[in-house]
Amino acid sequence: MKRLLSLIFLVFVFFAVMLTPPALAGDAAAGKTVFTAKCAQCHLGGKNLVNPAKTLSKADLEANGMASLDAIITQVTNGKAAMPAFGKLLTAEQIENVATYVLAQAEADWK
């Protein structure tokens, strides 16, 4: 009986860990400050004034392969298409914070 309870407990812990969303690495509050100063001109409220089909909504990020911290960091750092590179304008920490903020806002549907 003790083994069965131990097994059930371990299975429960395993699934609890596996179903917990990963913590975001950066500081979303600091990212909001940078986003407001550097990104909101084109991406206010998660929109995209240059290419309205590629917003910062969770669905669009997923559809465009951008729903990860690494993908957003890479695009902000290097730029892509009409989006300029910010790698020389922002520190790596600022870029990570912006990416964290964008993912958090996408999860909250930019509310």
Curated annotation (Swiss-Prot):
Q: Does the keyword Cell membrane apply?
A: no
Q: Name one Pfam family in it.
A: Cytochrome_CBB3
PTM entry text: Binds 1 heme c group covalently per subunit.
Annotated residues for binding of heme c: C39, C42, H43, M83
According to its UniProt entry, the function of this protein is described as: Functions as an electron carrier between membrane-bound cytochrome b6-f and photosystem I in oxygenic photosynthesis.
Family membership: Belongs to the cytochrome c family. PetJ subfamily.
Subunit info here reads:
Monomer.
Its name, as the record gives it, is Cytochrome c6
Q: Identify the coding gene.
A: petJ
